A protein has these predicted regions:
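Extended, non-catalytic subsegments within catalytic or DNA/protein-binding/adaptor domains
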Residues: 1-336
Length: 336
């Protein structure tokens, strides 16, 4: 268990379980430490980091307004959520901030604010935010289709470490329908090269917070060629354990640090602009949605699409299928 997790999860277990003599026997001490370790694993590391960041933001917001963050009054929490909505934060982000506040209260032995809110000010505020955001038009990032991505890959010219890496990132991002968080979390050990292409182990994802892990197949490919492009990157990267994709410095040289999810988004937008696409309407998620759109157009079955995308809700995949078939056998096709 790392130091951050120990601090976040280190409740006064000894004080609660100490015998009358206030001396913890060695066996009980070991069992207490085991319980702490299991609690530390109850949340994915990325979730704990996000909760810690959200909690620090809430603390700062409270201090500026001379409010007490712990234990927080329900009215203070509701007002904080409203301030996030006013700042343009997404409903999912606001919900995560609330979960972070509740989690930190529980770790400190306090009752979460929403569980001592007889007037339901938190629940009602959150419901109002969600109702307003549903009514507000949202513009999703456009899918990048295979033909456009092939042009983007071609625009990553040269044999510099950055160019070779960028080609591999783009090809693999679409071929494996990866979220940007999954792309940057990949380790070299998660990759297995096989005759047909490669097997990729996704250890944690948005829909796999317990870290059960999922293995997906990525064919070598004939258009985007994710297999050969990844092999080219590996010949530059080397076989040292660590992140699959390293960050490059200002001179384009390779470091040993992992890429950030934001750098992946910027990479996609940079090459999109190079081939004439609007960078404002594309992002890292455009690769994932591009795979699903292309798979739907090609007539792939929902189970096969789900194998790669790992989405639990079939309704999301059905949306891609409907979008891909909008103009097929159109009712007005023979007379318009």
């Amino acid at each position: 268990m790392d130091d951050d997790s120990s601090k976040a999860l280190g409740l006064s277990d000894e004080a609660a379980l100490a015998p009358l003599g206030n001396v913890i026997p060695p066996q009980l001490a070991a069992e207490i430490e085991a319980a702490r370790s299991y609690r530390a694993r109850s949340k994915a590391a990325n979730t704990v980091r996000a909760y810690d960041s959200d909690w620090r933001q809430f603390e700062e917001w409270c201090w500026v307004r001379d409010l007490e963050p712990m234990p927080a009054m329900p009215e203070a929490v509701a007002t904080y959520l409203a301030s996030l909505a006013q700042a343009g934060r997404a409903d999912s982000t606001i919900g995560r901030h609330l979960a972070a506040i509740a989690w930190h209260h529980r770790q400190a032995g306090q009752v979460a604010p929403q569980h001592r809110d007889p007037r339901d000010v938190i629940a009602d505020t959150l419901a109002g935010i969600r109702r307003e955001q549903r009514a507000r038009p949202t513009r999703k990032k456009s899918a990048i289709l295979a033909a456009d991505l092939a042009r983007m890959i071609a625009a990553a010219e040269g044999q510099s470490p950055r160019a070779i890496r960028d080609r591999a990132v783009m090809a693999l991002g679409l071929a494996a329908a990866l979220r940007r968080s999954e792309l940057v979390a990949l380790q070299l050990a998660d990759l297995e090269l096989v005759r047909e292409g490669l097997k990729l182990t996704i250890r944690h994802s948005k829909t796999d917070q317990e870290g059960a892990g999922q293995v997906i197949a990525v064919p070598s490919g004939k258009v985007l060629k994710p297999g050969p492009r990844l092999n080219e990157w590996l010949s530059v990267r080397g076989g040292e354990a660590g992140p699959l994709f390293y960050r490059t410095d200002a001179q384009g040289m390779m470091t040993k640090e992992p890429m950030s999810d934001r750098s992946v988004a910027r990479l996609i937008q940079r090459y999109a602009e190079k081939v004439g696409l609007d960078p404002a309407v594309v992002g890292a998620h455009s690769l994932r949605s591009g795979f699903l759109t292309e798979a739907a157009k090609a007539g792939a079955s929902l189970p096969k699409m789900q194998e790669v995308s790992r989405q639990k809700k079939v309704e999301v995949l059905l949306g891609y299928v409907r979008d891909a078939a909008l103009f097929e056998n159109h009712a007005g096709e023979r007379f318009l």
